């Protein structure tokens, strides 16, 4: 996979996904996908209700396309899933958004794709919960036809000092080759550098 020509799909355009999409889209062909039409309409007007991304950053994201249509994700090489994982009344994570995002990606991803998760999860979740959904809906085999990665989101909403580009970021992949691609990709937009974890589970525990 040639990193300079990679096509990205960012799933979820909240306070994590939008800044990520905006930074990547300065350099890469990027589709920002969200299921909320009103969110997409506001972003097309250059308005970010989370206030995490400035109008200048949105204007600079010259290769960013906003979409709520999964068909626009069919030619993507790398997906980055940034949907929320809220907790329920018993403080247990609600993985429903993660399951739905994995289903969306599984239905459109092509052989050779890499799916990176940033959503906050427990160690083991990516490979135990998300991978079977990706396999089910794609008909592809994990670590043969497609690969995964995990990079824990590190941004605190409203913190203008420790922003996406100047923090350091942990990365990981399901094979050494996938880990290399994921680490290289994030390294392009991060001034704070990256740290490659030994496995997805180690990155999830970080």
Where are these predicted regions, by residue range?
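Structural/interface elements that position substrates and couple domains in central-metabolism enzymes
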Residues: 1-206
């Amino acid at each position: 996979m040639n990193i300079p020509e990679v096509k990205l799909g960012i799933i979820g355009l909240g306070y994590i996904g939008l800044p990520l999409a905006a930074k990547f889209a300065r350099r890469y062909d990027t589709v920002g996908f969200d299921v909320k039409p009103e969110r997409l309409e506001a972003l097309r007007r250059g308005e970010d209700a989370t206030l995490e991304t400035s109008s200048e950053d949105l204007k600079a994201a010259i290769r960013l396309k906003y979409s709520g249509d999964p068909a626009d994700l069919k030619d993507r090489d790398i997906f980055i899933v940034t949907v929320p994982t809220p907790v329920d009344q018993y403080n247990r994570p609600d993985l429903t958004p993660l399951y739905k995002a994995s289903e969306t990606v599984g239905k459109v991803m092509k052989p050779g794709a890499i799916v990176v998760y940033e959503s906050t999860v427990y160690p083991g979740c990516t490979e135990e919960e998300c991978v079977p959904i990706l396999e089910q809906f794609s008909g592809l085999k994990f670590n043969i036809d497609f690969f995964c990665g995990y990079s824990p989101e590190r941004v605190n909403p409203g913190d203008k000092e420790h922003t996406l580009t100047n923090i350091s970021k942990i990365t990981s992949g399901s094979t050494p080759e996938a880990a290399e691609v994921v680490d290289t990709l994030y390294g392009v937009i991060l001034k704070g550098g990256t740290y490659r974890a030994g496995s997805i589970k180690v990155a999830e525990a970080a």
